[in-house]
Amino acid sequence: MLGVLRRYHAHDVLGLENIPKSGPALLAVHHSLATYDAFLFGHAVIRETGRTFTGLGDDKLFAVPGVRRFASASGILPASPENGRKLLNEGHLLGVAPGGMREALRPSSERKHVLWDKRKGFVRLAIQTGAPIIPVACPSADFLYTVYENRLTKLAYKKLKLPVPVARGFGLTLVPRPVRLTTYVGEAIVIPDGAIDDPETVDTVHAQVTAAIEALLDRRDTRDS
């Protein structure tokens, strides 16, 4: 399936040289509604670098049998500080989407917005393990679907933490639009030696990563030039 989607969207990754050839790194990924752009990126990393790449996913994913099997087969583990710390301490590449479901459910009026304001656990994890943070974003993924702002989506997320989007893709269907997808990998944000997990340090690094993601989201696919 991912091979089909890769060809359908002419998916490409720019900036793979920013991923270290060895040692731990935390890849902070912007979250789209479609989500599979992140899977395409993960498989590209494995294919092009030969490195093990593991992502952390929302616990809700693992409550649905079919989705659980797909997530597990794609190297996704339930999100927890323990899982993240173990992988980084073992020297692996770790992928996280700090915005989570909340960011994925953004209406199209908030395309390319970064909703990480209160999501700082990934920064603490990087500080605790010394792993660099690498920003990753696929701007055009926000154009695969038109997502409508509505009370049902907000209520389902607020009360039950369930994704109930109202969206459409190609025409009036849920088939994703044949948009070219380019994932951009930014330069690593290195945690300073001796950095401690205190609010000031966390806020400083968090602001750096957020600004880097926003810059990547402003990039335009040069193949459309």
Please place each PLM-identified region on the residue numbering.
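Helix-to-loop junction immediately C-terminal to a conserved catalytic motif
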Residues: M1-H31
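Hydrophobic alpha-helical segments of integral membrane proteins
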Residues: M1-V4, V67-F70, A156
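Short secondary-structure boundary/capping segments
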Residues: G3, E17, R68, R85-K86, ...
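Short gly/ser/thr-rich secondary-structure transition/capping motifs
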Residues: R6-V13, G75-A79, V166-A167
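Short, well-ordered coil/turn elements that cap or connect secondary structure elements
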Residues: R6-Y8, E48-G50, Q128
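A generic secondary-structure signal marking the coil-to-beta-strand transition
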Residues: H9, G23-A25, D37, R51, ...
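Catalytic core of membrane glycerolipid acyltransferases/transacylases, capturing the structured
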Residues: K21-G84, N89-E90, G100-L115
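Non-catalytic C-terminal accessory region of glycerolipid acyltransferases
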Residues: K86-S225
